[in-house]
Amino acid sequence: MHQLTHRPLRLAATVAVLAAALIAALLALPREQATATPPSGTAAELLARGTIAQAGHVRVAGIKLATRGPIDVATVHVTFQPGGSTGWHVHPGPALVTVKTGRLTLHRAKGCRTRAFNAGQTFLELGPDDVNLTRNETGGVTETAVTFLLPVGAPVTVDAPAPRRCPL
């Protein structure tokens, strides 16, 4: 009879342990994560890439540029078909984007800000903390020339997860 009174307690303890393990396992599962959005409808051509081998400081006409060591400078021609997009991305360093033809819309994850740029206008992408997507929202082709300042050997673009609060 002594064994019979402990059996329900053992069963209850086993159920409690299994329930706790199940809850812990469910909590350990990765939450739904935003996935990277690959580029589409774009073609990029590397025009040139080179290394500034030494540190330098330049201050001219309100422009200040300072490097602590070598950096790469890359220039890329990007063509956006109608609806073409870079996908959400960042750059390891700043990028100066000049719209050559057409119109390009910049969507920034921070604050879900959007701004359009026409041919002849230039905008700055700020580097690794500036998650953004650029897209041709017109019916014609848009072309850009982009100059990147990068750590030596770094890629010009790195895919980033789509921000949940900025649906496109």
Residue spans for each PLM region:
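Structural recognition of the beta-strand scaffold that forms the well-ordered cores
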Residues: 96-99, 106, 122-125, 144-148
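A short beta-loop-beta micro-motif enriched in histidine and acidic residues
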Residues: 68-71, 84-96
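Short acidic-glycine-tyrosine-enriched beta hairpin
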Residues: 44, 70, 80, 104, ...
